[in-house]
């Protein structure tokens, strides 16, 4: 029908079978558009199966790197505390910068970015797409 939509996230990687890749696609759309997207994906010859994880318990994480630039010693100590609270890794440290590696839910990553933007003048953020798998017992969105 020519309706357009925007991908929020796209991640592709090999699976336990090296001849098969798994694609995790994140979209925000109305129900009609979402059904259209699923139909389009299912009609592609290379697609083995489309799994809709909208209403099932899942585990989902997104990788993110956040670099805080131009920080002094006190700010670096504060960033270490923030990293501890959020459960993220301090990946690298420079004389006036700190690099954080985050593997959190999209919502938690957004909260971290908002906090860093609020507290520090110069930050650089790189996000990878989310990956998701159906949960065995609990959900982590």
Feature-to-residue mapping (PLM):
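Long, contiguous binding/interaction regions
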Residues: 1-22, 29-141
